[in-house]
Curated annotation (Swiss-Prot):
Keyword Metal-binding: no
UniProt gene name: tal
Pathway(s): Carbohydrate degradation; pentose phosphate pathway; D-glyceraldehyde 3-phosphate and beta-D-fructose 6-phosphate from D-ribose 5-phosphate and D-xylulose 5-phosphate (non-oxidative stage): step 2/3
CDD domains: Transaldolase_FSA (cd00956)
Protein name: Probable transaldolase
Subcellular location: Cytoplasm
GO CC terms: cytoplasm
EC number, UniProt record: 2.2.1.2
NCBIfam families: fsa_talC_mipB (TIGR00875)
GO biological process assignments: carbohydrate metabolic process; pentose-phosphate shunt
InterPro entries per record: Aldolase_TIM, TAL/FSA, Transaldolase_3B, Transaldolase_3B/F6P_aldolase, Transaldolase_AS, TSA/FSA_arc/bac
Family recorded in the similarity comment: Belongs to the transaldolase family. Type 3B subfamily.
HAMAP family from the UniProt entry: Transaldolase_3b
Organism for this UniProt entry: Thermosipho melanesiensis (strain DSM 12029 / CIP 104789 / BI429)
Length: 216
């Protein structure tokens, strides 16, 4: 499974790339606004760091505006993927962009039905929001499981990006189900490194090594 970082912070992206575990980045207007730099400049900087897909979201609500924004964003770098909201106008834009070879990521997906429509419209990626589904007492990962089954049944090439991830368990479940990608906040990615038994093992090895050196 590929791991994307869900952030627009350059320092976090650099760390993830240095660790050798980041395959791409997803952003949204909220994340970019927190980065404190102009939108296009931020996306360009990210593309210079990550040699993989970088999702940049449109802000227009009508299909004409989405298509125009998407064409401009796609000029920034060949790795830019256009995030489009899951709406009728959004899917109309996705269909047009797919015929032009511009990759799209349909976002704000909350059902397998929506994912089916996104795939039929030609989306390159679809982003089901598992954490937000959990927030309203629904099973977000069950939705992902349904999407995987539908895509497998009909051979859709749309890749599934498990989004709105809140904790390492979401990442683990996504991997066990066979999702293509998990887009992970930096804080969650950091938590994935650690286990108390690992820390105890390191401490023991260091103590034993110090005893060995002292006895020589």
């Amino acid at each position: 499974m590929k791991i994307f970082l869900d952030t627009a912070k350059i320092d976090e992206i650099k760390k993830g790339v240095e660790w050798g575990i980041v395959d791409g980045v997803t952003t949204n207007p909220t994340l970019v606004s927190k980065a404190g730099t102009p939108f296009k400049e931020t996306i360009k900087q990210i593309c210079e760091i990550v040699q993989g897909p970088v999702s940049a979201e449109v802000v227009s609500s009508d299909w004409q505006g989405m298509v125009e924004e998407a064409r401009n964003l796609a000029k920034i770098d060949e790795h830019v993927v256009i995030k489009i909201p899951m709406t009728p106008d959004g899917l109309k834009a996705v269909k047009i962009l797919s015929t032009e070879g511009i990759k799209t990521n349909v976002t704000l997906v909350f059902s397998a039905n929506q994912s089916l429509l996104a795939a039929k419209a030609g989306a390159s990626y679809v982003s089901p929001f598992v954490g937000r589904m959990d927030d309203i007492a629904n099973d977000g990962m069950r939705m992902v499981e349904e999407i995987i089954t539908i895509y497998s049944n009909y051979g859709f090439e749309t890749e599934i990006i498990v989004a709105s991830i809140r904790h390492p368990r979401h990442v683990l479940e996504a991997a066990l189900m066979g999702a293509d990608i998990a887009t992970v906040p930096f804080a969650v990615l950091e938590k994935m490194f650690y286990h108390p038994m690992t820390d105890l093992g390191i401490e023991r090895f260091l103590r034993d090594w110090e005893k060995y050196k002292a006895g020589r």
